[in-house]
Amino acid sequence: MDRDDELDEIRRRKMAEYQNMMQERAYEEEQKKAAAEEEARRQQILRQILSPEARERLSRLKLVRPDLVENVENQLIQLAGMGRINKVISDNELKSILLRLTENRHETRIERR
């Protein structure tokens, strides 16, 4: 009987591990789905408020400055949500926004002697 009890205990542990693993997978899939839905919502808003050229500029800039682009996108989405953007933002307008945001940036330079 000891042997059967040990086998039952091993089976119970394995079943609990399997159930935990399945719950974790379901949670991860749910999180991925929610993130994808949020990104789709953001892109829809950006399509409404940015010209195609401005969207293209942001997508190129995202390759080198993802933090800046995320900040700009968040601000634009927030302004659109408050109704403060009344027209489509052109590429030139986006350039001026980006210039204003980056001109305050301080660069640290290290000189080797």
Curated annotation (Swiss-Prot):
What SUPFAM superfamilies does the record tag this protein with?
A: Double-stranded DNA-binding domain
Q: Which family does it belong to?
A: Belongs to the PDCD5 family.
Keywords for this protein? DNA-binding
* One GO location term (cellular component): cytosol
- Record's protein name: DNA-binding protein PTO0204
Q: Which cysteines are joined by disulfide bonds?
A: none
| Species name | Picrophilus torridus (strain ATCC 700027 / DSM 9790 / JCM 10055 / NBRC 100828 / KAW 2/3)
Q: Name one GO molecular function term.
A: DNA binding
UniProt key word DNA-binding: yes
